[in-house]
Amino acid sequence: MRNRRKFHDFSPDVFMPSITIEHIAYVQIWLLDFSGFFCSFVANMDRKTFFENELLRCADVVSRGGVIAYPTDTVWGIGCDSSDSGSVEKVFAIKRRSDAKALISLVADEEMLEAVVGPLSAEIRELVRSDRPTTVIFEHPRGLAPEMLAADGSAAIRMTREPFSQQLCRRLGRPLGATSAKINGEPTPARFSDISGEILDAVDYVAGYGRDEAEPHAPSRIVKIAAGGELVFIRK
């Protein structure tokens, strides 16, 4: 019968090899790499959670007829439900302007845009897909509050690609009213820090996302679809 060595008969070196300084250094490097990855992972999760929470808060306020200040694909804006007359009138009151100058409606994608204005021509698709924010004035849109329309029944609509405003439109499932976050006649704020305290106090909620954006933004270009489908650039 073969002799079987008992567990305690083996030399400790079999199970506990010599640990060198190099081994310790490798472990330290690995731990540093892992801790850096873990911290980055947690930070990304925190940012994602913050983004989602702000979306939920803004969507809740807007869906209940409230008015928000929020980042858009151009300058910071005052927003509301484009289909709700009462909400639109609140925006006019905050900006101290009459309803003679209608608001812009933001949409999340081409599908939402076509639900409001009907099928898009190839030329219009090219415009709204442009990297540069482009507001298009459409004739006789559907589903918008009367206060969102100009005197001739047209409406200014822009497809946003900015993450927050785009996802907010999707959460609402309909266009989001937008106008610059300023009192009528005052300069347009290029950053959040440029918005007056009066505006921030007047809205029902101010989005926390995007406040630290340092780079200034400019207004969009504006294109009107004239009779016969001709495109007229109002602001380039």
Task: Give the ranges of each region predicted by the language model.
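Active-site-adjacent structural elements in enzyme catalytic cores
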Residues: 43-236
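Short hydrophobic alpha-helical segments enriched in small aliphatic residues
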Residues: 9, 14, 24-27
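Basic polycationic patches enriched in arginine
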Residues: 2-5, 47
